[in-house]
């Protein structure tokens, strides 16, 4: 009788099979628990303790993955255009540094610039790099100075005051300065852009500027990349292109400051209730206040190089340094020294603070001549025009006088205003000296200055009839 036997490997023992499966499962779990960087294997815990640990620690790796990696410095620089004048296009930011770096600035000379997104022409001007995705920076030349007043036509004379719409202001003088600036090789410029970021095409632009009361006329025709003077310019706008042989009477009709004053809208309730910008008077403060304009009244400044400039200084504006050249009106210092003895001198300009404040720091560093300074932000904006409302001074208007080469500037207090001829370069000018006797007499009388100013200059007689 033959017995059949099986080999040990072929015997099916259920106990051994279960043990083998358990060993294989534990081996795979140990491999899964091994850390990525090596190290001891972690035991795969089960039960209540394991559930608690998973509940506490389970969401941590997910949060770490959701947190983005820190941005590099180059990537952070992409967001710098949020604080510049460059219009936003809505496209993905270009990962290229668009930054202006100033190098050493010595003795008031403008330093050189490094602009990674612009090419430098042979004449020293900057040309936007077409390879970059960001639109060119908006040109802001001339905006630091006092703007030219917008023509107040019958079509818009009923506009409300305080409508801050600088886009409606026809700053013809500033456009002329832009044309002059682009002819100077040493000064950096950039292409003007529209509000949607598209650059204006180069076209022949004829600009005629009748500055203030028609005393100076500038006419230039040039091929330049310039924005339109206004959007749009009405046919009867005073600063549209005019014939070169226009007479003085025609120029006066182009922009009559007294027509502007006649139709200026009244101040709003909010403007009437503005808090005074000046501190209260002290015992040493003179009783009478004299408000002085800056540009073309005391000085004449230009971004073009002036050979007879009394001083020059750099101004940093919108990441670009502009060199400002200054002429001082004859008897400028003598006038201020005498008037500061009997008047509280207040400088009130429609220019930017970044320019005017720096100029005053040079002319009057110890504030011995000018006690207070007010700038464009203290003006009232009416239809894009900046008007100096004397109520913001917080002073007695019966003892307050303003001297300005633009009568429109004191449109709300015409009886307090003394007009003065605009000054640019006449070395024989003595208008400041001629005003000293009258100003000294007003203090001696110790009366309301307004009737005396009205009788002397008779500005109300120049207003057009109703």
Swiss-Prot record:
Residues 283-442 form the FCP1 homology domain. Its EC number is 3.1.3.-. It comes from the Eukaryota. Residues 81-97 have a biased composition (Polar residues). GO terms for molecular function: phosphoprotein phosphatase activity. Residues 1-137, 216-240 are annotated as: Disordered. Pfam families: NIF. SMART domains: CPDc. The keyword GTP-binding does not apply. Residues 60-79 have a biased composition (Basic and acidic residues). Keywords: Hydrolase, Protein phosphatase. Disulfide bonds: none annotated. Belongs to the CTDSPL2 family. Probable phosphatase. This is CTD small phosphatase-like protein 2.
